[in-house]
Amino acid sequence: MPKMKSHRGACKRFKATASGRIKRERMNGSHNLEHKNRKRTRRLHQSALLECTKKERQIKRMILA
């Protein structure tokens, strides 16, 4: 049986931290920023951790396959 390949789209969007949590980038922070206020754009450039453990397990399986 061939090796399992990791999901390339998931690998580009998510990173696993040292503690095993999944880190993601926030959406809506790359363009059309002129009508968003400064506080919002600052917040959009910060990365976030996934909250739902079910989704976390699915993404870990895709990344580490």
UniProtKB/Swiss-Prot annotation:
One of its GO terms (cellular component) is cytosolic large ribosomal subunit. PROSITE patterns: RIBOSOMAL_L35 (PS00936). It holds the Pfam family Ribosomal_L35p. Keywords: Ribonucleoprotein, Ribosomal protein. GO terms for biological process: translation. Gene3D superfamilies: 4.10.410.60. InterPro entries: Ribosomal_bL35, Ribosomal_bL35-like, Ribosomal_bL35_CS, Ribosomal_bL35_sf. The keyword Ribonucleoprotein applies. One of its GO terms (molecular function) is structural constituent of ribosome. PANTHER family: 54S RIBOSOMAL PROTEIN BL35M (PTHR33343), LARGE RIBOSOMAL SUBUNIT PROTEIN BL35M (PTHR33343:SF1). Belongs to the bacterial ribosomal protein bL35 family. HAMAP family: Ribosomal_bL35. This is Large ribosomal subunit protein bL35.
